[in-house]
UniProtKB/Swiss-Prot annotation:
GO terms for cellular component: cytoplasm; ribonuclease H2 complex
EC code: 3.1.26.4
PROSITE patterns: RNASE_H_2
Name of protein: Ribonuclease HII
Naturally occurring in which organism (per UniProt): Shewanella baltica (strain OS185)
Database matches in SUPFAM superfamilies: Ribonuclease H-like
Top enzyme category: hydrolase
Length: 210
């Protein structure tokens, strides 16, 4: 598995002329909830305009692209790791596990997997063979399939935080999405934590006296 600092779509021909899955994650930093990943195989005959790193897009644009990706992609799949798995494995290994779950859930086997960042887990095809994979630094702004994966993962997790906000409105999840903001710390100090919190994360451990 190689790591690239930059890579163009044309460069992909050096790796594969077949199906390419882009993979990205969201939610490594929050104190609460799953870490969410997505794997997307785009259809070259149905290009999607405006794909980019989800963090650089407005919420309205992400939502519109989410629907377009779901409609036009050959296939996509969300993978996740729970707070309990994060606490057991650590956030890095839980993220790798979630990525593996996303790729394993694709109903079309990719010939190449491209992962945003500087590392990639081992991906295995349905027949047990190891899939070729490469990590690409800032790939979510370089490779369309990774951009699409970042959008699917981001919108999915944000929606889950909205659901959590409806159940626990006193925490403000709809605004901070579970990240360690001042408002979130104040809510934790007043109301404590519940089972969706990541107990291995330092601010939560400190509150629980662990």
């Amino acid at each position: 598995m190689a790591t690239f600092k930059s890579l163009s779509e044309a460069d992909l021909l050096a790796f594969s002329t077949g199906l390419i899955a882009g993979v990205d994650e969201v939610g490594r930093g929050p104190l609460v909830g799953d870490v969410v990943t997505a794997a997307v195989i785009l259809d070259p005959s149905k290009p999607i305009s405006g794909l980019n790193d989800s963090k650089k897009l407005s919420e309205k644009r992400r939502e519109a692209l989410f629907d377009e990706i779901c409609d036009k992609a050959l296939c996509y799949q969300v993978g996740r790791a729970s707070p309990a798995e994060i606490d057991e494995l650590n956030i890095l290994h839980a993220t790798m596990l979630a990525m593996q779950r996303a790729v394993a859930g694709l109903n079309i086997a990719p010939e190449l997997v491209l992962v945003d960042g500087n590392r990639s887990p081992i991906f295995v095809a349905h027949n047990g063979a190891e899939l070729t994979s490469h990590s690409i630094i800032k790939g979510d702004g370089l490779i369309a399939s990774i951009s699409a994966a970042s959008i699917i993962a981001k919108v999915t997790r944000d929606r889950e935080m909205d659901v959590l906000d409806a159940a626990y409105p006193q925490y403000g999840f709809a605004k901070h999405k579970g990240y360690p903001t001042k408002a979130h710390f104040e809510a934790i100090a007043e109301h404590g934590v519940f089972d969706q919190y990541r107990k291995s994360f330092k601010p939560v451990k400190a509150l629980l006296g662990l």
